[in-house]
């Protein structure tokens, strides 16, 4: 008996899709946004909602993520809502639909791949369905699918899988219809790469991934490879361009990434350990890992610090060598490994990204389960098809069970964040999240005790220092001494982006009408302490933020002259008409009309000096807004 005895791969695929939807269903009820969701989606409401071309252009082409801004991904968020604040439950079903589409495209592409390998049709169908079902039902994909902003990674993967499938379809046509074949391959590669890149930059890997496929495909007289010239232009050239780009990023100088707590060698050492952890989670799945609190991950400071660094690096080299060796004897094993490595090339190598994120496996793991499917095929041929069916079914059910339990955990934000915090005792962000939850629950004594313990454990962490002060400001219990102590610590602590956000939160709360008057002066002193911090200069945006926050505080203190000076200094640092106009509106609202007109002139100057491509709206729209604001200010001034 062979796999031909059982002829229901399409039914199994349909069951896998239905099972995936059922497993993810609890997670769709989680009505909360996480981390990077808000910075990327709050722009929906900046202009009163996306309701016309100007607001559409501003949102879709004004993205802040990556070099491209990822406009295609941003455009899809408009399928779910066109304003902000919004409801997370409106976005998550779209993410799940994309996940299912990715699984179906992966299945189609894998089937076409196996046909290129000249597998028998029945076996190819079973292998394609099983391996793609493993990917579709794997619990590691939950943190990509239910984390709304990771739609960017999903869409990029979707177009990569589509491009691969179209390319492999065209490749099958080469012997009999070469013109159609090259049309399919060229269009699929070009369009797939373009759409994927404008979803997320990982899409640039498509030519390299197809080179990996070509490398692992055996030479077959009846299945000719694409012409050398075509491969050179369409596959080798873009792949080499990507590799050259990465090579140009190599810089082992200390302090190359001022916003990171590691340098480039330390990142590479750490990634060697992290990639093995990814592989462990993929082949030994668990319900929930460390989540998004990875700031406590132990950075490798050398080949033997920690000692696992060198074995991890040597192990990856050995795995890569084994894949090259296995290319002819076990090509699917070689393909799975090399595809995985190629998929991690951008995000797990020399670029200054954060160290660890599960979503980096969403694309990379696409072909990783093919060797497992081939193992089941061996069982079916050597023993009985029923045995292979039972083993494969049990594996898929286990994956589905873990995914369902993980989706249950993702249903409740507090439950999820508390779990992550318990799993990451070395993460300052985890402590900060638990304190926020306890504060919302009005468990203030527990929150204060936890913060005190966290500040003792992480004395150099500016975010936790500012959070402790913020807790006292919330309760209107902060004294001048509290501000002084926080400032003394802040002047020598390691400064980072979470600390910048914490400072803005402090100013927002200090400016509320029921706060003690001395809070404003004390906060100005705190900002000055921050400016004395030696790591402060690493963050150019914080200089403009600092001036802006000072302007707000002086304006609230009824010191319009100094407020005007700080606002205008901030505008010069921003060099952007958008925040400039926002500041003009704030100044005018405080009835400092002379300052508002002076600042409006600076906003006009910023507009004149700004390139069209950097504008979030059309130049005409800004010019009309400046005229409108000037008229309003003049009218108010004359009353």
Predicted regions and their residues:
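Polytopic membrane enzymes that build or remodel cell-surface glycoconjugates and lipids
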Residues: 2-472, 476-480, 484-497
């Amino acid at each position: 008996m062979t796999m031909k005895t059982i002829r229901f791969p399409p039914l199994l695929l349909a069951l896998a899709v239905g099972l995936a939807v059922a497993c993810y269903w609890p997670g769709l009820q989680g009505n909360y946004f996480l981390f990077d969701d808000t910075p990327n989606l709050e722009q929906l409401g900046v202009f009163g909602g996306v309701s016309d071309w100007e607001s559409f252009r501003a949102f879709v082409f004004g993205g802040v993520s990556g070099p491209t801004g990822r406009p295609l991904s941003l455009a899809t968020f408009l399928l779910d809502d066109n304003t902000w604040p919004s409801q997370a439950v409106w976005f998550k079903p779209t993410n799940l639909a994309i996940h299912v589409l990715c699984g179906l495209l992966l299945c189609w592409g894998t089937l076409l791949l196996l046909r290129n390998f000249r597998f028998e049709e029945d076996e190819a169908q079973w292998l394609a369905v099983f391996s793609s079902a493993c990917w579709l039902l794997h619990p590691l994909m939950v943190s990509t699918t239910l984390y709304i902003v990771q739609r960017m990674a999903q869409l990029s993967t979707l177009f990569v899988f589509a491009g691969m499938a179209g390319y492999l379809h065209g490749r099958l046509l080469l012997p009999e219809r070469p013109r159609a074949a090259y049309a399919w391959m060229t269009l699929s590669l070009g369009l797939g790469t373009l759409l994927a890149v404008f979803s997320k930059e990982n899409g640039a890997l498509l030519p390299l991934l197809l080179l990996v496929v070509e490398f692992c495909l055996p030479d077959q007289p009846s299945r000719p490879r694409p012409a050398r010239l075509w491969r050179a232009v369409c596959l080798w050239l873009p792949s080499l361009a990507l590799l050259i780009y990465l090579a140009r990023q190599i810089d082992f100088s200390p302090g190359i990434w001022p916003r990171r707590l590691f340098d480039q060698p330390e990142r590479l050492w750490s990634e060697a350990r992290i990639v093995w952890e990814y592989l462990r989670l993929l082949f030994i799945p668990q319900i929930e890992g460390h989540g998004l609190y990875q700031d406590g991950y132990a950075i490798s400071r050398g080949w033997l610090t920690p000692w696992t660094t060198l074995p991890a690096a040597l192990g990856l080299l050995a795995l890569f060598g084994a894949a090259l060796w296995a290319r002819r004897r076990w090509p699917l094993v070689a393909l799975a490994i090399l595809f995985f490595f190629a998929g991690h090339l951008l995000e797990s190598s020399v670029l200054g990204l954060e160290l660890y994120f599960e979503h980096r496996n969403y694309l990379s793991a696409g072909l990783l389960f093919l060797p497992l499917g081939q193992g089941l095929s061996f069982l079916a041929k050597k023993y009985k098809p029923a045995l292979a069916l039972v083993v494969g079914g049990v594996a898929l059910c286990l994956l589905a069970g873990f995914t369902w339990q993980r989706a249950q955990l993702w249903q409740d934000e507090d439950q999820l964040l508390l779990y992550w915090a318990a799993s990451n005792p070395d993460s300052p962000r985890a402590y900060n999240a638990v304190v926020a939850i306890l504060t919302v629950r009005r468990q203030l004594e527990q929150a204060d005790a936890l913060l005190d313990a966290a500040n003792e454990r992480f004395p150099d962490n500016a975010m936790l220092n500012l959070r402790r002060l913020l807790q006292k400001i919330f309760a209107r219990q902060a004294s001048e001494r509290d501000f002084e102590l926080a400032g003394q610590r802040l002047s020598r602590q390691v400064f980072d982006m979470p600390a910048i956000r914490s400072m803005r939160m402090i100013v927002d709360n200090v400016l509320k009408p029921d706060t003690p008057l001395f809070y404003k002066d004390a906060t100005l002193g705190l900002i000055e302490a921050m400016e004395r911090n030696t790591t402060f200069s690493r963050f150019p945006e914080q200089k403009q933020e600092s001036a802006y926050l000072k302007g707000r505080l002086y304006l609230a203190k009824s010191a319009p002259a100094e407020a005007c000076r700080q606002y205008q200094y901030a505008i010069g640092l921003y060099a952007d008409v958008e925040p400039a106009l926002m500041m003009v509106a704030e100044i005018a609202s405080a009835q400092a009309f002379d300052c508002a007109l002076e600042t409006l002139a600076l906003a006009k100057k910023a507009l004149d000096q700004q390139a069209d491509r950097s504008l979030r709206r059309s130049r005409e729209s800004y010019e009309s807004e400046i005229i409108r604001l000037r008229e309003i200010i003049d009218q108010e001034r004359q009353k």
